[in-house]
């Protein structure tokens, strides 16, 4: 071995990377370390009598060290005795300081720092053999040996005479039997390993807990008679919404149900009612995700009132089905062909944008007067779906006597008591709070015969068809007590709503003379006498032939059965008093037509002679505040 340079004098500090080892670590666990004294170094020529002994001494030391590692309960004094028999003690005393050996080489040697480089070949394997205990020590599982906590607990239980121990007795056995835990029995240092013991007792299937017979005593821990698993059992977890199989099954069923409902809705999208269900502001225009909770946990019934989306497909019922008492006679007039319809409520038409979109789609092309339009022709691509009742004018229906209007003599404006028919048709209430009878717009615009017999009664045989068209086109709203006068030319009549110069009341939107009023406010009628200054929201229909007062019943404007001659129409109605109309103003004000505003319709159309080839043009005016 080449000689290393001389070390510094004894008073000089040593490099911290190559700090000398202390002597007590040479023979203690886990690995003996040689002591390097900087004041004394090995000599290249030690005593000759000590040269053949290091090899044999290393063999004995390694064998004793391997026995020491496998033994769990070892005595530190025995380890010191082994190292005391080793010749390195005498070598250290006899050797003078030798500066030639390098510190790294000294660190590589194990307990023989003074072995010279000129040793015999028998002593040369000793540094290599000293590395083997270091490899074997790295395989130790725990600080006390190769035994695990479960093995120690098993030994503790087996060592007891009754083959059972409580938790505190297991703690005591650990402190008494395992040297590593002897100085760790106090409360501060025992928290960690005691917690590990509790975990191993509860997680291993080889340990079984037995209830103690005595009251207030700890349970016994015994070994599993069936043996159990040597390893740990799978970790137990509390049932939650993520790993609960019951919740997963219910969630899967809800997903399947949603898929089937969506497929059924897609299959029914070809119905005529679905082509206008996505108009802006309608409840159907919202996505199906908004009602996912409803569709998942609450099944929809067949009732139209419980339908969430508000989409109603037209259904062709039989003639006999509509003869029941639950069908409102005002909503469904007696006719040969009937068709239910869906109309958006006026509360959804509260802004001008929705109204413009609605009225732009309301283009009804009228056929010639010689042809009668069928109900199917009125299913237009528009926001409203108007259906026609019986457009043919026949004999007065026998059920018409159900409308109990008081017929007066020649007074154009008189008190008319009404019989309120309860509305039992729950399916029609799903339309909205402001329903409009079906077929009115088409019947007023396209029919060349007088309107239906529940609108105008054939009490005056002298009424011609032209005059009935003038009557239909001159239907208007009279929001005040003063009724303006309109001309009777059939080609220049316009239908509009004109607020009077007096303070206007809450206007009721009128579509071709029919008022869309709240279906609960007008039912509560009271005998309130009104004067000129009191605004009257009752709709008045006027023609050149006479005046037909219109009453309201459940939100529908109906023409009273009044036989009036053509010559009795006053030329100026500005000074006429409206004294005998009964109206509950409080209910009208309370149940305002709109929350956001009020609707104002204006249908400007020029009527040609005996035909209506034009479409109705609509404009939206500014809202009149109520």
Curated annotation (Swiss-Prot):
GO-annotated biological processes: cellular response to cold; cellular response to hyperoxia; cellular response to starvation; energy homeostasis; fat cell differentiation; intracellular glucose homeostasis; negative regulation of apoptotic process; negative regulation of DNA-templated transcription
InterPro entries per UniProt: FH_FOXO1, Fork_head_dom, FOXO-TAD, FOXO_KIX-bd, TF_fork_head_CS_2, WH-like_DNA-bd_sf, WH_DNA-bd_sf
Key word DNA repair present: no
Example GO molecular function: chromatin binding
Disordered: annotated segments: 1-57, 90-142, 218-319, 484-519
Entry PTM: Phosphorylated by AKT1; insulin-induced.
Subcellular location: Cytoplasm; Nucleus
UniProt keyword list: Cytoplasm, DNA-binding, Nucleus, Phosphoprotein, Transcription, Transcription regulation
CDD domains per the UniProt record, alphabetical: FH_FOXO1
Biased segments, Low complexity type: 37-48, 101-133, 262-277
DNA-binding region: 144-238
Cellular compartments per GO CC: cytoplasm; cytosol; mitochondrion; nucleus
Gene3D superfamilies named in the record: Winged helix-like DNA-binding domain superfamily/Winged helix DNA-binding domain
SUPFAM superfamilies named in the record: Winged helix' DNA-binding domain
Keyword Membrane in record: no
Signal peptide: none
Pro residues bias locations: 1-11
Positions of transmembrane segments: none
Extent of Polar residues compositional bias: 298-310, 484-494
Biased composition (Basic residues): 248-259
Cited PANTHER family: FORKHEAD BOX PROTEIN O (PTHR45767), FORKHEAD BOX PROTEIN O1 (PTHR45767:SF1)
Identification of the protein by name: Forkhead box protein O1
Gene of this entry: foxo1
